[in-house]
């Protein structure tokens, strides 16, 4: 059973909580935290699951087994999560985003590094660096859904592309991505990509609709 908070006030409890109004709390540990209203955590929080349908701001770190964001989430510190499912807008201003698995059909922005074993994105990602084992980013053209969130948050300067300085993983598949460097074993550079440099040690496929400045490494080029 969830402890439900509505209206304005300060949340001072742990456990299972649901927020429907405007609530501020100092941080703490939760089993499950659901945000349907406007919620601000003044400190770091730990939760088994964090479900955001409203607007959530954390002024510290966030650590959870599961993050499900259908609303707008801003994290001033670091984000550590086993699985993140992002259909809304999530912005992380700390040094690092760490996850086992990230699924992004919305918008994910990170001020610095995203580190995840698996990243599957049909939305948009903006970060300085992404490292992992398997990275799939298929960002291509704006939709009405994304445009709405981008107007609210201005999460990306160019919403037609995901923009990452460095992408490094064993397996990489990209579409609609701008990157300075892409390093990996097996790489697919799809249409609407603009990549300055690709370092590939396995197989490499480059779509005719992509722009790649330089290719280095021992890659086997395939069509």
Where are the regions that the model predicts?
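Extended beta-solenoid/beta-helix repeat architectures
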Residues: 1-223
